[in-house]
């Protein structure tokens, strides 16, 4: 994914999500998947719910969803992980001669931006299991003060701050900084 400014996408909508996948960890033996709502709010999200919702948000047809879910199930089965999938409510939206599958009971703000991320994990079962077992997802936005942006930029010890009244730049210490941030692969979703 392309990052432009402070490891966060420069966009007009400005929802930003940071995703951290441990480079090494033990796997869980059970994962419960539910559709969720992931937008601009400052929240820590469940990786399984985020990924399950992302599968729907990055798929245009029911068969595409089914194919991705089967790949996910095959990976979980190969790692001896039991699972449960909550209900996903969908409808088909038509635009001209094109038809799109849409979620009714959840969303990820500009979720289609996660297409490469979803495909990468479905093609790397070990990384997917690490993400679902011990991964981190932080949602937020970049329409706010740097103190709030620290919530999603946990791999940055200091963030740039600009005071518009004095036209001065400074650095602020990130209270959410993760000293072990190098133990994770980081991904950024924004738009």
What residues fall within each predicted segment?
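Long, non-globular targeting/processing and low-complexity regions
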Residues: 1-2, 8, 15-191
